[in-house]
């Protein structure tokens, strides 16, 4: 049985322990003075910190430490005791090594924009539950990653190593990785073992490296059975890669390479692919049937390629016309031959492909235009057209009309130049149409991708005003009917016409700018008689005035004899005027005196010569230093010329 005294002792002990533990609990939940804490989120970012502050609450889950100056020494050892922290943002700091003393259960670590050079097993093994590792914009190289550094990172799903110094893909990556970003490195070769075993990889980004077809190993991507997105943008490929994983690949990006051919089996079995981008390459044609296995394709981007619309591309026209409405194809615009430059491949008729076995004869007719002097209603203002290559023998016909075959829906086009940079397009339709596609491009310059300008006009309209064109330049204008489903009619041929904008001198020949731009100076043989007479009178007047001025200047000394240059007459200009008069005397300077001697024997008038003191410029001292003990009666400037104030006359 416990005595009352012992019971009181135990109660007092418990109370004392409570008051001792309570302050520790309060301290544990306190927030560092330089940070802001909000329900597990600790905001210590953008504070110019050099170390992680102490006293972070134990219930913290996310640490925002970015945009500081924290270095490796500034990471305290007690940081690893924060067992609830799952996300740490340490990007844009001063780390030069992979940080240690991190919480064990961290899942997301942002270390981009530091100067980290090495990745070691010791640093990664202490955070085995890491799922996302961001190491973009550091100095990691292939040799600085320790072999087996990731062998305990069994939960790693995202690894970002963009903009580092990698020359190859790091080996020994965990099988759990789902997204791997290696863009903007120096990778030139990828061997099959590099990606071996990454069966969970879904997204692989290799943009901006040094990869070519020789640097890609055979079937290097074939075993990536779960890969859904592959990006090889901005590399040096000359052919589309083959042996791609066909079971899951949905997006393939190949733009900005040097691809000039596509192997016939490049896209075989890619039945899940729905987006393919091969823009900005050197493709001129495509092998027939290259897209046959693309059952789910919905976005095909082929912009900025020098497509040659010859007989080899006729199958592409047929394939485009058979596509359903949901398929969006962009960039199949002819760049050659000359007669179809700037036209969409799907708009071409069969005879325009110049197939030798084709017996189709063109039914496009060109008739003389009927001038239309009526000014058009307010039109639209399209974007400027990119310049096109020179045409050796252009046959440009102004204000002409073009019609289609009588068996087709006839369109009669009339084009008239309104101003040097504006043309008026009008048309008449034989049958009602829902909409028409109107396109125009400039001829006569080097080929440029995406050169044609297009717009859709409704069937109710009958005219269009095109502005912002170049004066005195040839243009091709085409129209083709469209249906409401946005698909071209299979039996419609584009109706085209060539015209030329008016020269500038037809509208404003008197401005200086236009005269400078004209090849020959502006001439007007019909000058008014009054203008000729006025010009002659002006020339005679100018000649007489010049003669009078010359005579006054030549005989100015005669007038000077009747004038006395005294102190009361424009004192400030005496020296300036004296410098312009003819002087017939010589100033002789002897040892301590000077004398004016006339050249001729004519007597010198006393009042005709007056000597004035010439005031020196600012900063020049003409006075003798009173402190000097020299006995000379002359003081010198820097140039050694005797000072006139101390000369004897």
From Swiss-Prot:
A Gene Ontology BP annotation from the UniProt entry: fibroblast growth factor receptor signaling pathway
One Gene Ontology CC term in the entry: extracellular space
LRR repeats: 58-82, 83-105, 107-126, 127-152, 153-176, 178-197, 198-223, 224-246, 247-269, 270-293
Subcellular location(s) of the protein: Cell membrane; Presynaptic cell membrane; Endoplasmic reticulum membrane; Cell junction, Focal adhesion
Mode of membrane association: Single-pass membrane protein
Tissue distribution of the protein: Detected in adult brain. Detected in embryonic rostral thalamus neurons (at protein level). Detected in embryonic rostral thalamus neurons. Detected in neonate eye, in the inner plexiform layer and the outer nuclear layer.
Main location: membrane
Glycosylation sites (chain numbering): 282
PROSITE patterns associated with the record: FN3, LRR
Extracellular side: 29-528
PTM comment text: N-glycosylated.
Residue numbers spanned by region Disordered: 629-649
Transmembrane segments: 529-549
Outcome after substituting residue 181 to N: Abolishes homooligomerization and FLRT3-mediated cell-cell adhesion
Observed effect of gene inactivation: Heterozygous mice are viable and fertile, but homozygous mice display nearly complete embryonic lethality. Most embryos die at about 10.5 dpc. A majority present disruption of the basement membrane and ruptures of the anterior visceral endoderm. About one third display a pronounced defect in the fusion of the lateral edges of the body wall, resulting in cardia bifida. Mutant mice display also a defect in proepicardial cell migration. About one third of the mutants display abnormal morphogenesis of the neuroepithelium and headfold fusion defects.
Induction description: Up-regulated by FGF2.
Listed InterPro entries: Cys-rich_flank_reg_C (IPR000483), FN3_dom (IPR003961), Leu-rich_rpt (IPR001611), Leu-rich_rpt_typical-subtyp (IPR003591), LRR_dom_sf (IPR032675), LRRNT (IPR000372), SLRP (IPR050333)
Segments for region (Interaction with ADGRL3): 38-67
Cytoplasmic membrane side: 550-649
Cystine pairings recorded for this chain: 31-37, 35-44, 309-334
Subunit field text: Monomer and homodimer. Self-associates (via leucine-rich repeats), giving rise to homooligomers. Interacts with FGFR1. Interacts (via extracellular domain) with ADGRL1/LPHN1 and LPHN2 (via olfactomedin-like domain). Interacts (via extracellular domain) with ADGRL3 (via olfactomedin-like domain). Interacts (via extracellular domain) with UNC5B (via Ig domain). May also interact (via extracellular domain) with UNC5A and UNC5C. Interacts (via extracellular domain) with UNC5D (via extracellular domain).
Job description of the protein: Functions in cell-cell adhesion, cell migration and axon guidance, exerting an attractive or repulsive role depending on its interaction partners. Plays a role in the spatial organization of brain neurons. Plays a role in vascular development in the retina. Plays a role in cell-cell adhesion via its interaction with ADGRL3 and probably also other latrophilins that are expressed at the surface of adjacent cells. Interaction with the intracellular domain of ROBO1 mediates axon attraction towards cells expressing NTN1.
Protein name, entry field: Leucine-rich repeat transmembrane protein FLRT3
Natural source organism: Mus musculus (Mouse)
Gene this chain is encoded by: Flrt3
